[in-house]
Curated annotation (Swiss-Prot):
<comment type="subunit">
    <text>Forms a conjugate with atg5.</text>
</comment>
<feature type="compositionally biased region" description="Low complexity">
    <location>
        <begin position="1"/>
        <end position="15"/>
    </location>
</feature>
<keyword id="KW-1017">Isopeptide bond</keyword>
<dbReference type="InterPro" id="IPR007242">
    <property type="entry name" value="Atg12"/>
</dbReference>
<keyword id="KW-0833">Ubl conjugation pathway</keyword>
<feature type="region of interest" description="Disordered">
    <location>
        <begin position="1"/>
        <end position="55"/>
    </location>
</feature>
<dbReference type="InterPro" id="IPR029071">
    <property type="entry name" value="Ubiquitin-like_domsf"/>
</dbReference>
<dbReference type="GO" id="GO:0000422">
    <property type="term" value="P:autophagy of mitochondrion"/>
</dbReference>
<dbReference type="GO" id="GO:0019776">
    <property type="term" value="F:Atg8-family ligase activity"/>
</dbReference>
<dbReference type="GO" id="GO:0000421">
    <property type="term" value="C:autophagosome membrane"/>
</dbReference>
<protein>
    <recommendedName>
        <fullName>Ubiquitin-like protein ATG12</fullName>
    </recommendedName>
</protein>
<dbReference type="GO" id="GO:0015031">
    <property type="term" value="P:protein transport"/>
</dbReference>
<dbReference type="GO" id="GO:0034045">
    <property type="term" value="C:phagophore assembly site membrane"/>
</dbReference>
<keyword id="KW-0653">Protein transport</keyword>
<comment type="similarity">
    <text>Belongs to the ATG12 family.</text>
</comment>
<dbReference type="GO" id="GO:0034727">
    <property type="term" value="P:piecemeal microautophagy of the nucleus"/>
</dbReference>
<feature type="cross-link" description="Glycyl lysine isopeptide (Gly-Lys) (interchain with K-157 in atg5)">
    <location>
        <position position="173"/>
    </location>
</feature>
Length: 173
C-alpha cells in the first residue's frame, strides 16, 4: 500500500531530484537553476559575488564634482530665472459678500511670495488686524503664503492674468 508518493506528498508535483554527484555540479552558496532550456544557454553568466569585505565609503571631498553645469541645464535655469524677474498681472475678483475694489487689476513682481499679494489686498480693503481675508486662485484652491507668484502665474494663468478670488469668510470647504 505504500507508494513513493504517499511517503512524500510534495514529490508528486516536483521533478525527481538527482543526488549532487550525478548532476555534475557542486553545492555552492547559490541554488542551482532548475530551468534547463535553450534560454539559459543564451543568457550571460551571473556576475560572481566579491569574496572580500565592503569597501570604505568615499568622503565628499573625494567624490566627483562638476566644475560647471551642462549646457541644457544652464539654459533651463536661465529660462526659469527669467520668468521670475518680470512683472505678473493679478486680477482680484470678489466673491459674494466681499467688498469690491475700484481697480481690480494690479502688477506685482514675479519673484514675490503670495503673502505679498494677501498683504496688498488687505491694505486695499482697509482690513483691521482682526479681519480675515481668504484668497483663492481661480476660485479653486488657496495657495500657501510662501508660494511664488511667478510659479502660480505660470501654472494657473488665465488670459495672462493670475485670477485671485477673495472673501471675508471661508468660501470653499
Amino acid at each position: 500500500m505504500d507508494s513513493p508518493s504517499s511517503e512524500n506528498p510534495s514529490s508528486g508535483n516536483s521533478p525527481p531530484s538527482n543526488p549532487p554527484h550525478l548532476t555534475g555540479s557542486k553545492l555552492s552558496h547559490r541554488p542551482a537553476s532548475r530551468r534547463q532550456d535553450s534560454e539559459s544557454n543564451t543568457r550571460s553568466a551571473p556576475i560572481p559575488d566579491d569574496e572580500h569585505g565592503a569597501d570604505l565609503p568615499l568622503t565628499m571631498s573625494a567624490s566627483v564634482v562638476l566644475s560647471s553645469l551642462p549646457r541644457d541645464a544652464h539654459r533651463a535655469l536661465a529660462d526659469a530665472e527669467a520668468v521670475d524677474t518680470g512683472k505678473v498681472t493679478v486680477r482680484f475678483q470678489p466673491l459674494p459678500s466681499a467688498p469690491i475694489l475700484k481697480n481690480r487689476v494690479f502688477k506685482i513682481s514675479a519673484s514675490q511670495k503670495f503673502e505679498t499679494v494677501v498683504k496688498f489686498l488687505r491694505k486695499k480693503l482697509d482690513c483691521k488686524d482682526t479681519d480675515s481675508v481668504f484668497c483663492y486662485v481661480n476660485s479653486v484652491f488657496a495657495p500657501g503664503l510662501d508660494e511664488g507668484v511667478g510659479g502660480l502665474w505660470r501654472c494657473f494663468k488665465v488670459d495672462d492674468q493670475l485670477i485671485v478670488s477673495y472673501s471675508m469668510t471661508p468660501a470653499f470647504g
